């Protein structure tokens, strides 16, 4: 079932924690991979909202009432963003068609504060998830991860609690059973 999952992983794909992943940073997480090459991998957790708002955490974003998200356990004091406006934000890197990572923060602030860009077109993250060369491959061999296709609907979804099960279930077949498994299998 998990054969060749690692070979399917590229920038722009989703990385899904397997049901056996119990490590607290990644338990039942859905990540968007933004970089994946021989040097390592980098992505952002999509389904871990934090309890404070962007305007409370990032200077210059006074009108952004959306929640900030935990991007991952690496460099947790760094700010990153995913957005759909590569046409307006310079220095953005296209991750998949219509979805961009990063860009000019001052432009983002201006676009949001003037209403040219809507908060639903961007997500902000504290930190990121990162793996050194070979590390993620080893985790795949241990059965820690699955892959899936990314869509803007998943990336900008507010259904955080159901995101993992819905995304795993959408893979079909035996993954539908996995998606319905209890969080702590030994507790049922």
UniProtKB/Swiss-Prot annotation:
Record's GO cellular component terms: cytosol
InterPro entries linked: AlgH-like
Pfam families hit by this protein: DUF179
Protein family membership: Belongs to the UPF0301 (AlgH) family.
Protein name: UPF0301 protein Cag_1601
Organism whose genome encodes this protein: Chlorobium chlorochromatii (strain CaD3)
Organism taxonomic ancestry: Bacteria, Pseudomonadati, Chlorobiota, Chlorobiia, Chlorobiales
